[in-house]
């Protein structure tokens, strides 16, 4: 049997596994001369491509029947030129109500590191807009790898100007310097939707509500609405994909998506929702959320069933009461729901990058109890207390204390019998470690939805007048820093096995972060094992924005969160509080001089952080060569309304972080440069 027939069999198996129609490349195919007319109204959510490989890419569209012109099958054309004079692949795919009129198409047999154009054609000859896509370089291709990573786009109360900026800049670069793909790290949709007529002035926390997502069913929880079935989730994706800037981005680059929490439910674990503080079994809803994600994301992921459509497993909503050693519920309906779609995957991108993507939400543990803990006014948790609570029954090798001491306080340990805080699960953890060990590219990039970097500050150094804010002897306070058992397992393995080039890219935090992941921080042993970068949100509201809108001016210690300038403007000093300590932010309040404030820094506080901006919107790009990796933060102002200019509007700053590939036993070292604008208190 010849290699071509073997390749066809392999691609057919691949297409079947991911539920996509297949077209195998034909370099001699010519476009038919039939007159074709573009009808974007018949393809209202545009076109997209995803998960590029050296020889294939997934293509996607939605051909709606709502315009009065029905279609049952679409032809798909892939060409090496935007005029479609030279076709390289052609096939057809069904569109049915079973997939909400979406379709997925695996264009295979393509050449590596190539630019292609594609379109969909209905039975009447109407065409979609033309999409552009790119294949990955071959495994031995050492050209620089360039990609963007993004997260947290909320089109119901913000504009996607960050995509406009990305599109504008990329189109003006030489071909060899353009982005190869966009890594979307989750919160592609926000399932929480406020309806403008239900909020004062049609506003929510200073943002204009668009009303562009309205659930056909839904449930009102507090002041917002959430999905209750598959139709609701599909409605959210349809509404989001009407955004012109998101459509343009998906038409220009292949996307590589994973999900975060909002694709299912913002407060949930596995298949269980938390509504008004009560746990609600939601196995059916978890399956529905996974199906909608699968239908609207062009990703090479494994789904339930073997056919071309998502075959939803039959599940019942049941409480989850029994958990394994990492907190994964063993109730059969829960296991079926969380495994209905497996988005964790790994791929090589040229010679310089091994990409590993994990599912950080489907297997996340329930979270421990925080009942009976002392009331602390300061917005942080004592690090020593979190160290015990976070690890649950696994603390100290399975010997957690019955009580926790915090200075002069002592109280029962509510988590001594609970599973540890974890999010990968035992099976995915083993898979991840195997893939990390097997990675041979210089840069091992972990696509992580929410990141591992710890945020902490030093309220123990507050002036005596604020002693009531923090328990005596409590030490450092942590704002984010859970899942320590899993992180130590991974980072200790990286250190012990001499793995270099570990790079974590993340989202979720609505903030820009740059730093070094480490198993521990001072006064415990600090030994970084890699570098980590977190991108700001595309449009979702930041902590800095919320603080400036809601924090009273007479609130004690306001200066730790907001720096009030003499001219009446405000800046997020929470960045300085976490980077340099409470004394630095208090000196800033007194002097107004960032240099004097940084001179008062606590050097033990955050040696793992080089950059932090809790008021940053935008995106990040990565450039990876054999011996260096560069990450650039592109920050824009709050995107309240869509920019009227093609460049997406003004910039706040552009900052790069470079790191040379380090050797086993060495520590990575980030080098920072401000290329444009002023990041202010973020450094």
Give the predicted meaning of each segment.
Residues 1-19:
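N-terminal secretory signal peptides and thylakoid transit peptides that target proteins
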Residues 14, 28-683:
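Long, structured stretches of catalytic cores involved in phosphate-ester chemistry, encompassing
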Residues 21-25:
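Hydrophobic h-region of N-terminal signal peptides that target proteins for export
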